[in-house]
Amino acid sequence: LPASKVDLNLSGSLKKTTELSLTTQGVLDATLTGDVKLAEDKMPLNLQLKAKKGQYAFADSLAPLKINDVDIKLTGDLLNYHAEVVGGVEGMDHIPHTHVDLNADGKLYEVTLNELKLAALDGTARLIGSSNWKEGAQWDVTADLNKMNIRPYVPAMPAVLSGKVSSQGSADSNHWKVDVPTVDLTGSLSSRPLSLKGSVFLSHETLLNIPDLLLNYGDNRIAAKGTLGDKSNLDLDINAPSLRGLWQDLAGSVVGKAQILGKLTAPTINTDLTVQGLHFQGLDLSKALIKGNVVSEPQVKGELTVKAENFRYGDSIKLHNID
């Protein structure tokens, strides 16, 4: 830990109210003031931390996390508190300068986000919701985005997004579920219009349930509907003539339909796909036609036509023609 200067002053009574003043210089230039009733039940407190600047490197391979002009207010007691946080944060390679404005209430095993506002790169995000970890983990969160640039957080997907996403879920040692009932996003990706709308549900019982999910990216349209699990019935409708820009180092065309039925571990697959100029990282495929069906149980059988030209994966696999 880098050297820091610390100045602490205490006054008052340990049996009634203890007033404190703490000043630090070095890693964190900050002042903490307030009072605490140490002898009372739940320890009532009223604290304020003002930090002009501070930074700390959590790992040698990452840029340090930096904060500036942070004001934190904490009132209530250890079992029922109210927190307000305002300030700036940046660093760790992928966090642009972001203004944070938090208003929250909490108890020993839960926290309620009355409002969390983030502003960065000319965009904003507003989150409200709650989380509880008394018995496993539970959450209920809604995010509203307005021209939010996610490229610093997901470098492979340089998108600017507006709209709403909501999620509820829970997890413990035996069960888990994640419900995303609302996905309604619009914006741009790699200078092309983008929209993603629908809902998704995942759980330990049914791995994936998609009532409907539609991605539009430029002239590309990818729709998914159905379930994956012990009784899979998932339909994919892909009309993607130009995938370039959807993800880093992805290019090519995929058009057609696919269906997955039955047990996920031994599925029946029906497919009719045409692929052209596909490239992703170390994989290249000039052209392919995949049509037919494959049944996995009780034994693998079916009728599948595969025609491909110039398939290459890295330097280890090269095939000129597959028929």
Predicted regions span which residues?
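Glycine-rich phosphate-binding "P-loop"
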Residues: L1
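Extended lipid/amphipathic-ligand handling interfaces
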Residues: S4-K15, L20-T24, A30-M43, L47, ...
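Transmembrane beta-strands of outer-membrane beta-barrel proteins
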Residues: L20, L45-L47, A83, W139-V141, ...
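Sequence/structural signature of outer-membrane beta-barrel proteins
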Residues: G54-F58, M92, M148-P152, L185-T186, ...
